[in-house]
């Protein structure tokens, strides 16, 4: 059993404070009875919660760490390619989606969830969530490039990336850390410095 205000907040009906106010105004019903107490206990999978006459669908949040393979796209549906959701059909009915995207030829860690608030926190640059990639590349890395990564690199469309970190493991192998996710960003960052990514995996 869980508090009604907690469940409704998780379902994005408002902040915890806003939801409490809505309940006190009688906006919600449980099993046909109008509820006015925000701490009213319900079983979200067994009780019927309604708002303005419509039944609220409740899904428990799920969090999946997927090692995305190559040739699979980061989408919920595609008529041509296999998607990450196709790899886990048992979760499709829970309205899960990938948090961000990896290019079709990129492998590695991808979070799958139905928690929109978490997805926003992970994707928004203002939260500074670092993403780490292992890569191999062709070309010559120069020490002065470290300054470029730290200050931001100007891409082919004129966009300047946020500061990143580049860590050489050995010749033509490195880790790169970024906290944004522009289209083909890692590949384009290296191309701006006359290097070419030959393999990319988020770790």
Locations of regions flagged by a protein language model:
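Basic, flexible Lys/Arg- and Gly-enriched helix-loop patches that mediate nucleic-acid binding at interfaces
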Residues: 1-203
């Amino acid at each position: 059993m869980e508090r009604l205000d907690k469940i409704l907040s998780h379902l994005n009906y408002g902040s915890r404070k806003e939801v409490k106010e809505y309940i006190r105004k009688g906006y919600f019903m449980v099993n046909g009875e109008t509820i006015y107490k925000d701490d009213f206990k319900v079983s979200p999978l067994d009780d019927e919660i309604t708002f303005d006459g419509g039944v609220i669908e409740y899904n428990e949040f799920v969090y999946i760490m997927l090692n995305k393979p190559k040739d699979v796209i980061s989408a919920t549906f595609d008529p041509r390619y296999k998607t990450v959701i196709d790899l886990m059909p048992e979760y499709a009915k829970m309205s899960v989606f990938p948090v961000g995207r990896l290019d079709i030829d990129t492998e590695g860690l991808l979070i799958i969830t139905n928690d929109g608030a978490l997805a926003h926190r992970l994707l928004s640059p203002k939260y500074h969530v670092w993403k780490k990639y292992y890569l191999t590349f062709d070309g010559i890395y120069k020490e002065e490039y470290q300054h470029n990564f730290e200050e931001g690199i100007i891409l082919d469309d004129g966009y300047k990336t946020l500061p990143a970190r580049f860590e050489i493991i050995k010749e033509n192998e490195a880790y790169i850390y970024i906290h944004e996710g522009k289209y083909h960003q890692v590949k384009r960052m290296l191309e701006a410095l006359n290097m070419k990514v030959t393999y990319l995996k988020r770790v």
